[in-house]
Curated annotation (Swiss-Prot):
Residue numbers binding ATP: K428, S429, G430, G431, N432, W433, T434, N435, V436, K449
Pfam families: PK_Tyr_Ser-Thr, U-box
Family matches, as InterPro entries: Kinase-like_dom_sf (IPR011009), Prot_kinase_dom (IPR000719), Ser-Thr/Tyr_kinase_cat_dom (IPR001245), U-box_ubiquitin_ligases (IPR051348), Ubox_domain (IPR003613), Znf_RING/FYVE/PHD (IPR013083)
One Gene Ontology molecular-function label: ATP binding
UniProt domain U-box: residue ranges: 688-762
Enzyme Commission identifier(s): 2.3.2.27
Catalysed reaction equations from the record: S-ubiquitinyl-[E2 ubiquitin-conjugating enzyme]-L-cysteine + [acceptor protein]-L-lysine = [E2 ubiquitin-conjugating enzyme]-L-cysteine + N(6)-ubiquitinyl-[acceptor protein]-L-lysine
Its biological purpose: Functions as an E3 ubiquitin ligase.
GO BP term, example: protein ubiquitination
EC primary class: transferase
Organism expressing this protein natively: Arabidopsis thaliana
Signal peptide range in chain numbering: none
Family, similarity comment: Belongs to the protein kinase superfamily. Ser/Thr protein kinase family.
Protein name: Putative U-box domain-containing protein 50
Amino acid sequence: MEETKTHELEVEAESGSRMEKVYIAVGNDVQEGYKTIHWALKKWNNIPISIVLLHLCNISQDFVYTPFGKLPASSVSEEKLQVLRKYEDQKIDKLLSKYITFCGKVCPLSVNFVLFGKSKSAISGSFYVYQNKPEFCEFYIICGGKMVSLKNDVNNNNSNIRSWIGKMFHDPGRNLDRSSGNNDDPTASGSSWDKNLQEIENYFQQLLSLNLAEEETENVVEEEQEDDDDVALNVLQHMDVAEKLEYVRRKVNEAKLMIDEKSREVKVNAERSNRAEWAISLCNSRIGEFEAWIKEESERREKLQATLDSDKECIEEAKNYVEKGKTKLHSLAELQEVLSSKVKTMMEAKSQAEVELERVVLQRGEMITEIEKLRSQRDVFNRRIEFCKEREVIGSVSKEEVKCGYREYVAEDIRLATETYSDRLRLKSGGNWTNVYRGRIKHTTVAVKVIGDSLSDEAFGAKVKLLNEIRHPNLVAIAGFCSQRPKCLLFEYMHNGNLRDNLFTSQRKSRRSKILKWHDRIRIAHQVCSGLGFLHSVKPKPIVHGRLTPSKILLDRNLVPKITGFGLIMHSDQSDTKPDVMAFGVLLLHLLTGRNWHGLLKAMSMNQTSILRDLDQTAGKWPLELAKEFGALAVKCSSVNRGGNMDFSTKEIMEELGKIREKADEFKTKGGYEEATNSNMDEGDPNDIPSVFMCPILQEVMKNPHVAADGFSYELEAIQEWLSMGHDTSPMTNLRLDYQMLTPNHTLRSLIQDWHSKRAAQASS
């Protein structure tokens, strides 16, 4: 019967903590036991544990260890049996005391552990404990102070050996790349393994069982031998001679038996050696095959590794490309966000600008309406002012002599005003030169008409007196005269030329031409009729113009018409005003159609509906009702010598024109046709010349504008000629110039060139 002596070393833990135990199995080898305990203390030095020392001893009630060997207890006296057992107990107690002294104080551990000191005599017991230990317990085998790795139990070892042998005998060519054409065919060598597979497996199992049996036998023999040696020292002291002889005889017989057994073992070992050489040769051949396969596998792995490295490089490049793409995408996303915010801001600004533009457009419309009203008021005031001035002049003439109502100039004044009758200041009419010059006297621009010697001094004086007596807002007023040769008459200067140059298309190349709208034409007709009616109402005899044509109608800055060229037939006996009425009717047709041809009157008389077809489109969209009435009045005036219109006077014409003008003003105030076409005609007509483009001297569009000291821009040739003639004053202000240096006006020149380009484009389209 085996007995286990234990000695438990415990250290009380803190209250409430649980003490776990570490079981350390020790044997009779003290040094080996010390190493095992030292390993356990080092492993759990910082953990509270309780150490339990285990010592296994074979104590049986039926057998006892004596110097003669293991004998039955019945063959030994009771006294000797007690002595032997007491000696064994003392030896174990001394051994445990040494272990306890070595341990010292230890701390408890929360897990149970079992440690076995490994020695040759404890191998089989260790395996037994390992196989039968509970699952919650950890098991360690310590040999020489170091942990020994454990193998599985015998059954697991057998199955593992079978599995290992099966893998070893399995054809590894199946796991290799079958596509390789250089591999050796493993069928021949594998067939020998297949044939000997079971035999080799049995051989290895036999070796394993023999090793375990021999180890156990050896352990038992060694243990018995050690025990016999220890016991023999004490037992032989109590034996007599006969017992000692019997003991020697038994030992001799045991030696003989041992020799026979060893002889048999030699034979068995020789057979086992042959079988081992046979197994080794098979294993060596198999190892060679495995090495060849391993080499092929290594080469294949190297190729796969190279391919893998190449793929990794491609993957890295792809990753880098993706990262760059992500970075670029992130940048584009940020840029898109910035652009989106800018677009949003611009859209908001655009919305605000559109709202502001609508507001400005409304304000512009209101301002245009207000400007038109102010212009109308200005025209009315100007006409009233002129009328008042004329009345004052007429009143003064009736009381004083001729020279008291106007001024007489000397020939030198006239030469200075006209720059000695320079052709540059000579005025044209319909492209033909006239005997009228533009001049400047006393800071006032005047028109100087050269009479020459065509009239005698008496006739010239009578003409001057007559012109001075006749004053009307729609008649050109005389400003002075010169009785010295050449005789001259001075009239107020009309800046917009005559009606012919402004009305007819062939004459609109003049720089001073203006686009006359339909309501302006009605107003001009009414004002011309007013001036003509004033001439016809002179007492005692009416003054007949006799040559009323568009060239005899001059326009001032405000497009107010004034009649010129009258007074030549005032002393004749002719008192019939019908020629003037007929001429006025033709003038109305000119205003309506903007055409100047001899068959116009005949065509209109034959078919009055053709008037609507031949309306002047540059005048804007005529109201249908006004166009019909205006055309009917024109035909009626031009047909005064035919039918029942013999007594049609200017007074009646004035009444009808007054009604037509009232309707025209009403249309214009309502903003009907006129506002719908006025902007289009202003934008599309290339003849509407900005005043800033005109040279103040030549009254033509400048080609090379230069700025003088007075701040005005002039044509270079004109201002140079002005300065070369000795003038040191401004042509516009008549003030002294501080210097005569001229500066090119590039900005104005660029604007003029752009204006010419637009005119050419509009003309080509």
